[in-house]
């Protein structure tokens, strides 16, 4: 019951990025005990770091603060799906009151590990919850899991690229083959690219060590690159930007 009540307090404010509007920890912590929350972050980069810090700040605003009535355990998968699964399994075995999963692979792993338990999962930075099987087709939560999406405005991106590069023909996309969020985004680019006079060229990687070579090959074939919410690729973004600058290929 404690887990369910905590989840109700937290998820109501997720869309706004802070935890508001459903009472405070003082209202729900009838046993005056501490809550234990596990944060599973898929990779180390700025946008996901901001998600983590924003979540912790939101907890504090709701009256849940480390060292007082809250214990937080943060684990980073270093962009490895097997590690994300292990982290999720560990949180479940430790009987956390709630798991916060940051990015699609970590969210999928947390859901799969916690599905037959009473541990709720709150996710963020998930591009398409339906495609990741974290929500139904009508956008309803699946089990005790809910969260927010960071889906890209693909058509707006294509419009901008066409406006800035009127002669461009081919857009390159680097992506991680195991990230469902990237597969979905590529489908969206391929769906709309022809409407704006583009073709899409992709290069897949399985880890950050492959990014440099994949980027070098892709840069020879395209007029520009566009970036996805791909955690492995974003982790290697400084390398990609350096290569693109040398090749005089713009990156969006």
Regions found by a protein language model. Give the residues of each.
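Short, low-complexity disordered leader/linker segments with a strong preference
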Residues: 1-36, 61, 65
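Extracytoplasmic "Venus flytrap"
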Residues: 36-62, 73-82, 178-182, 232-235
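An alpha-beta-alpha
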Residues: 37, 55, 146-193
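Stable alpha-helical elements in mature extracytoplasmic
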Residues: 47, 51-58, 83-87, 102-106, ...
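Structural motif
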Residues: 71-93, 203-219
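Beta-alpha junction/loop-to-helix N-cap segments that form part of ligand/metal-binding clefts
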Residues: 77-136, 230-245, 249-252
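Conserved acidic residues
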Residues: 97-99, 169, 223-226
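Pocket-lining segment of extracytoplasmic ligand-binding domains
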Residues: 174, 180-249
């Amino acid at each position: 019951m404690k887990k369910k009540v905590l989840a109700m307090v937290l998820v109501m404010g997720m869309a706004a990025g802070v935890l508001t509007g459903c009472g405070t920890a003082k209202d729900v912590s009838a046993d005056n005990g501490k809550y234990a929350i596990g944060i599973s972050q898929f990779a180390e980069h700025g946008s996901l770091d901001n998600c983590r810090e924003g979540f912790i700040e939101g907890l504090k605003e709701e009256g849940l603060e480390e060292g007082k009535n809250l214990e937080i355990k943060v684990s980073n998968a270093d962009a490895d799906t097997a590690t994300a699964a292990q982290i999720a399994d560990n949180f479940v075995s430790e009987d956390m009151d709630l798991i916060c999963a940051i990015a699609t692979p970590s969210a999928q792993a947390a859901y799969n590990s916690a599905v037959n338990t009473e541990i709720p999962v709150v996710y963020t930075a998930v591009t398409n919850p339906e495609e990741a099987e974290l929500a139904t087709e009508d956008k309803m939560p699946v089990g005790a899991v809910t969260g927010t999406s960071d889906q890209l405005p693909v058509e707006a991106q294509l419009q901008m690229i066409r406006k800035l590069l009127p002669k461009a023909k081919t857009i390159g996309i680097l992506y991680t083959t195991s990230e469902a969020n990237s597969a979905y985004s590529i489908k969206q680019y391929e769906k709309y690219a022809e409407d704006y006079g583009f073709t899409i060229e992709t290069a897949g990687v399985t880890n950050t060590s492959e990014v440099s070579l994949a980027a070098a090959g892709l840069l020879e074939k395209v007029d520009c690159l566009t970036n996805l919410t791909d955690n492995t690729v974003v982790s290697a973004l400084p390398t990609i930007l350096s290569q693109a600058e040398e090749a005089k290929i713009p990156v969006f």
